Amino acid sequence: MSTAINSDLTDRSKRWVVGIDLGTTNSAMSCLPLQEEANLESVSITQRISENQVSRLPTLPSFLYLPGEHEMPLHAMELPWNQELDYAVGAFARTQGAKIPGRVVSSAKSWLAHRRAEPGEAILPWEAVKEGRKVSAIEASRRYLAHMRDSWDYDHPEHPLALQELVLTVPASFDEIARDLTIEAADRAGLENVTLLEEPQAAFYTWLWPRRKTWRHNLSGVNEILICDIGGGTCDFTAIKIDEDGLRRIAVGDHLMLGGDNLDIAIARLCEARLGVKLNL
């Protein structure tokens, strides 16, 4: 009897398809109702933006700040759903990490694909301050996903994120190990039933959906499509073949640790050269 009741509750709680982009520098969520015609919506994510302010932002910066024992009051990390946090995730973590880089974890996603490091070993921040706390790449990813779960659940108490149809994007160039580690991070965050979708394909589907009835006309004369996904920490390339049977993925580029972060540094170096000063990068 209890099993039937629990199943009924689960069915009534499942209302959305939720897409999660666990990014190298920024993470995001979008949702679409299952039972009605509607447009895709971006999901704002509640997060701390300073010691004294919590706000809703369109993305969650993928930064984890691990403060020292007496660095700041505990209330500086409180969130509406948890008043006992001893770390910060998101905008405040990014801002605080710029002040003390040795206490902030960034680019955890890249470490999931790093074969010369153990993703389950607590090695981040890579250049941590002396006696500073460290976490693994999997744990950092778990905290980002858990934060997005908690923010969603706070806004949708009757429709918990874990009970929705979940799609989690990964780079097309992620190997099976990196994909399994992403699934493990989601499992640890309480998101056990997720479908992985390659990021360039997700971008292409976004273009394709409003043209689903006319795409052959839109792509008349085109034989192949190259999707270039330049992210915060990686570049991802996917080639799609157009033939009589439809669309077929035919190639994926190598995993390139090159992205917006590198572009920022290149611009900063150019500014240094032109200004004739050394910047604190």
List the predicted regions and their residue ranges.
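Phosphate/ATP-binding catalytic cores across multiple sugar-kinase/actin-like superfamilies
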Residues: 3-4, 13, 143-159, 206-216
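Gly/Thr-rich phosphate-binding beta-strand-loop-beta motif of the actin/hexokinase/Hsp70
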Residues: 6-40, 212-249
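Phosphate-binding loop and its immediate beta->loop->alpha context
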Residues: 41-188, 265-281
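Active-site nucleophile and cofactor-binding loops and adjacent substrate-binding regions
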Residues: 52-55, 195-201, 258
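Alpha-helix capping and helix-loop boundary segments enriched in small/acidic/polar residues
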Residues: 173, 177, 225-226, 254-262
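Short acidic loop-to-helix transition motifs that present clustered carboxylates
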Residues: 175, 198-205
